[in-house]
C-alpha cells in the first residue's frame, strides 16, 4: 500500500481503502451475532446470514431496539477491541507517525456497560435496520470530539497525539447502495458546521443549504467490501445513508490516534 503521506489520492480526496485482517472481521461478526441472539432471545445460528439476523431484530419494538442497541452495548469486548488496537498500532509507519492507537471508551460508556473496562478501546459497531431512522446527520468526526470535550463522553487517550483518522468497516449487509458515503475533498474545505439538540444529546450537523448544494458529491468509496475498510481524515464530511434494502446493515468503526 502507498503510505498515507505519499498518497496523492489521500491528500486530495481525504480517504482510501485498505485491507482489514480477516481474522478480526470474523471475530467481530461472531460477537455481533451473539449480541443479537442475546438481545432478541432468538437462537440465530453461529454463522447466521444477514437475512436471519434481520428477522430476529425485526421482532424487537423500536423502543426495545434503542435500549438493546445503545452505543455502550455495541462496543466490542475488551479482549477483542484490544486485538484491533494491536493491529492499528502496527500501522504507524504506514500513517507516517511514530505511534498510533485507539482512544479508550468514555467514562459515560464505562458506567453504562460495566462489562467493559476503563481501558477498553473504543471499537464499536452499528446496526441500521431497513426502513428505520437509525442514521444521523452528515458530519465530520472531529465535531464529536469538539462537542464532547470536557464532558463524561470525552474519551481518554492512551498517549498524546497529533492527528485523528477514522476507519469504517463493512461487516454484514453492506454493498455499494447501502454503505458509508463520503464527500470527496471536503476535509480541505471551509464547511458551515452546526450542532443540533436531539433526544440523545448534542449531535454534529452541517448547514442544510450547503448539504443540498453538495448532495451530488456524496458517493460510496467501496468496493472491495470483504476484509477491507475505508480510512479517512477526521475532517472529511461523510454519512451513513438510510437503509433502503430489505436487510440489516452492520458496520464497525474506530478512531485512530496518531503521534507524528
Kindly label every feature range from the protein language model:
Residues 1-101, 224-225:
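N-terminal auxiliary "cap/dimerization" subdomain that precedes the catalytic jelly-roll/cupin core
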Residues 15, 120-122, 162-168, 177-179, ...:
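Extracellular structured ligand-interaction cores
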Residues 59-132, 137, 149-162:
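Signature of the catalytic double-stranded beta-helix
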Residues 135-145, 237:
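Histidine-centered catalytic micro-motifs
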Residues 147-175, 224, 255-258:
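Short, conserved beta-strand element in jelly-roll/cupin
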Residues 161, 175-237:
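Double-stranded beta-helix
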Residues 169, 184, 247-260:
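A short hydrophobic beta-strand segment most commonly corresponding to one strand
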Residues 237-245:
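Short beta-strand His + acidic residue motifs that chelate non-heme Fe in jelly-roll/DSBH
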Amino acid at each position: 500500500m502507498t503510505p498515507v503521506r505519499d498518497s496523492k489520492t489521500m491528500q486530495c480526496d481525504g480517504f482510501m481503502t485498505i485491507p482489514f485482517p480477516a481474522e478480526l472481521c470474523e471475530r467481530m461478526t461472531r460477537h455481533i451475532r451473539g449480541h443479537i441472539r442475546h438481545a432478541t432471545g432468538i437462537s440465530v445460528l453461529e454463522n447466521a446470514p444477514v437475512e436471519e439476523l434481520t428477522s430476529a431484530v425485526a421482532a424487537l419494538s423500536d423502543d426495545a431496539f434503542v435500549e438493546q442497541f445503545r452505543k455502550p452495548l455495541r462496543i466490542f469486548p475488551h479482549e477483542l477491541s484490544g486485538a484491533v488496537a494491536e493491529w492499528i498500532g502496527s500501522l504507524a509507519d504506514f500513517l507516517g507517525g511514530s505511534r498510533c492507537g485507539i482512544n479508550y471508551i468514555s467514562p459515560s460508556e464505562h458506567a453504562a456497560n460495566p462489562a467493559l473496562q476503563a481501558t477498553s478501546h473504543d471499537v464499536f459497531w452499528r446496526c441500521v435496520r431497513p426502513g428505520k431512522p437509525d442514521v444521523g446527520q452528515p458530519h465530520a468526526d472531529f465535531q464529536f470530539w469538539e462537542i464532547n470535550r470536557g464532558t463524561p463522553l470525552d474519551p481518554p487517550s492512551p498517549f498524546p497525539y497529533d492527528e485523528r483518522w477514522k476507519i469504517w468497516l463493512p461487516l454484514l449487509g453492506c454493498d455499494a447502495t447501502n454503505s458509508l458515503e463520503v464527500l470527496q475533498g471536503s476535509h480541505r474545505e471551509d464547511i458551515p458546521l452546526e450542532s443540533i439538540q436531539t433526544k440523545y444529546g448534542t449531535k454534529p450537523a452541517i448547514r442544510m443549504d450547503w448539504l443540498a448544494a453538495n448532495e451530488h458529491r456524496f458517493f460510496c468509496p467501496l468496493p472491495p467490501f470483504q476484509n477491507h475498510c475505508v480510512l479517512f481524515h477526521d475532517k472529511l464530511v461523510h454519512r451513513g445513508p438510510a437503509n433502503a434494502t430489505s436487510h440489516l446493515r452492520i458496520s464497525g468503526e474506530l478512531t485512530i490516534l496518531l503521534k507524528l
